[in-house]
Amino acid sequence: MKVKKNIIYNDLTLLNALQILQKVKNKTLVIVNKNLKFLGTLTDGDIRRALLRKVKITDLVQGIINHKSIITYDKKYSATVDKKFRKFKISLLPIIDKDKKYVGFHEFKKNKISQNQFVIMAGGFGRRLGSITKKIPKALVKVKQKPLLEHILAKAIKENFEHIKIITYYKSELIKKFLISKSYKNVKIYKEKRLMGTIGGIKNIATDSNNLNYLITNCDILTHVSYKSILNFHISSNADLTVATQMKIVKSQFGNVHVDKRNITKFEEKPEHMENIVIGIYVLKKSTVELLKKIKKNKIDMPDFINFLIKKKKKIVPFPFVEKWFDIGNIKNLNDAKKNY
């Protein structure tokens, strides 16, 4: 039994809860009132799904608490407790007393994350970074004295991903040399014989039939959002593909006019509109990877594959980011990451 950790009060905002969730191991919060009466639980996925329903990030957690949480009165990790974990596929089981007050929680002792693959796409040329990537691959560009690849690997390893693969092409030998110098365990490197697009390279590494899901990130994406949270969201959504996204206000560089036949009916000075942008982190179910492997083309880009899945009527869900993240795709973004990551 564990206590204190993972508890929040019901008057915190969703943003507060998300910030706390990124720091806790099992990605589940226990919600109580000021008298420590147990009210329910809340996961990262609960919050993300609420945001997709247009709930505001500044709203209180009180409005989206899972009041039907599975609980136990047993303070010892018994066979009954273990059975509940396996039956309901949960990672945290709150313990309450006869007065419905929260006293602690159990964590599931089996770590299922080892059944999932973590893949870093690091084959691109990184041409938008100019002279920086003429000598080194983008994956080895440094932010806060560490290569991008080292930041991503440290985060994945900390979150207990046990099977990590890196797909390379451009200056692959430098990435291999870096990995050897760090003596990483359970990290394998694969060099493409030719560029296979932003997702095609997965075909060559998807050989382990025991893997349930593949979490894929571009090597130039830095975020403090938990990879495990994205994976858990994908699993709980029963999605074929999960795409990390964020709503962004885009301002036009030009004025815009509305025309009705020959007449201008409205003028807008550099109008703004919302776009749901793709971040560069995905989770694919095993069966989705099998579909990818059946495509005969060697070079496959993610937009084409997503449209292919849409035609197949597969379940594709967004994982909405509200947190800041960094796409190290150009000099401006690199400098931003060096300052703010």
Give the location of each predicted region.
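A conserved hydrophobic position in a structured secondary element of the catalytic/binding core
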Residues: 42-43, 170, 217, 259, ...
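Active-site metal-binding loops of divalent metal-dependent hydrolases
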Residues: 125, 219-221
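Catalytic-core segments of class I nucleotidyltransferases/pyrophosphorylases
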Residues: 215, 222, 228-231, 235, ...
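Conserved N-terminal catalytic core of the sugar/cofactor nucleotidyltransferase
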Residues: 52, 146-218, 229, 297
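A short, conserved acidic/glycine-rich loop-to-beta-strand motif
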Residues: 237-247
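Short acidic/polar active-site loop segments enriched in Thr and Asp
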Residues: 27, 91, 162, 212, ...
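Bateman/CBS regulatory modules and CBS-like beta-alpha motifs in cytosolic regions of diverse proteins
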Residues: 1-20, 24-26, 31-34, 38-39, ...
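N-terminal nucleotide-binding beta1-loop-alpha1 segment
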Residues: 106-134
